[in-house]
Every structure is written in structure tokens, then in C-alpha cells.
């Protein structure tokens, strides 16, 4: 796709943008010894949702959390739980994630499950569903599913580990995804390496949701409220300063 067209489409989106900015704390960067308190603090600090990475060590070479942990964390907040599912077979976890109190499942396109069937099954469990685009995926890969999902999550790092540097090369993909979404009521999130500066770049490209771990839970001041407010303000101001014409 011609990146000039993508840029122009991104400007059109920003000029008419009405979807609220959401800051979504990722507990992969939290203090594992006190996760309940960390989730509660992220909620009280203004986090809009809670991002839970479920990594089984097979898809990506890391281990994180599972449904029993999510169920244990559920009493600490009423904010929605988003599960970034990096475990196989993915379909085998839907029942347990629902029972654990999760609200949204984010699916990778290449984990061996039929995506259409997975989307249908997740909806049948009264949960919402999103698709994840890794740095290797193309924006067009989401096209067959756009009318059946609630969010597209563009990875701005290689998935599986926290604390990585933001991949600036993903910004054209964010703009392209925004163009493909059009006027559908679909959130567009970026996930990985989100700081005040990179949130500005992603917001200008069309993102409205920002999954942030290190910049919240490992902020220098340890004040999660200040960190979340700073990210939200950075993204909001970036869109306000965007071109008003197309």
C-alpha cells in the first residue's frame, strides 16, 4: 500500500476522531509478589482495562499467567480483563477464561486454530474478541474478520516479553489498520514499548488504546496515577495537534 495514502487516511481519521483514549496497564511488568495489590492500584490510578498476557512457553519462549491466576485477581477490580492468548491449543482455554472472569480474548492469527470458529466460540461465551498483529503479520490479514471483532492489537515489539524497545517501523501498519477499520466500532491498540513519546506517535497513526507495562509499573516515581495520566495526555494532545484537513 502507498504509505502516502495511509498517511492521508490517518489524517482523515484523526480529524474526526471521537473514540476515547484508553490506557490499559499490562501486569506482565508488575510486581509478581503482590499482583492483587498491583491490579487494584492500576484500577484506582485510572487504568481503563487490565491486560493479561497468557504465555505457555510453546508459542513464545516465556511463561506467564493462566486462568487460575486471573480468577484470583478478579476480586481486586471491576475493570475488564483482556487476555492476550499466547497458548496452544487456543480453543481449549475459552471455558476456563470465561470462568475466571475474563471479558475479552485477543487472538493470534497463526496459532493453528480456525479463527472464525474461535471468534464464534468466544462470542458464544459472552466475551468480546480481538485480533493481534505481530510485526510479521500484514494489516490485510484482519480483513476477513473485521465485522466480527472489537479490537485490533498491533504489537509494537516482538511478543512474549516485556520491557522491549518500541518498533517505530510498525507505525505505517497502525495507519493502514485504521484505514481498514474505517467507521466500524473497533478499537485500535498498540502493545509494547509504550511511553509518552511513542504514545504520541501511535496516536497520530490512529491508535486509541495503549497497552503499557513498564512505563506504568516501573515508572521512576512509582506513582501509577501520574504515569497513566501522562500517557493519556500525551496521546490526547497528539491527536489534537494533528492536521485538520485531508
Describe the predicted segments one by one:
Residues 11-13:
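Short, positively charged and aromatic/hydrophobic N-terminal segments
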Residues 22-26, 50-52, 81-85, 105-107, ...:
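Hydrophobic faces of well-ordered beta-strands that scaffold small-molecule active sites
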Residues 31-34, 92-96, 102-187:
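Conserved anion-binding
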Residues 35, 53, 97, 152, ...:
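Conserved, mostly hydrophobic/aromatic
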Residues 49-67, 157-163, 216-220:
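Glycine-rich, proline-tolerant flexible connector loops at the mouths of alpha/beta enzymes
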Residues 52-121:
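N-terminal active-site wall of soluble small-molecule enzyme domains
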Residues 107-113, 153-163, 205-227:
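Glycine-rich phosphate-binding active-site loops on the catalytic face of alpha/beta enzymes
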Residues 217-244:
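C-terminal helical cap(s) of enzyme catalytic domains, especially alpha/beta-barrels
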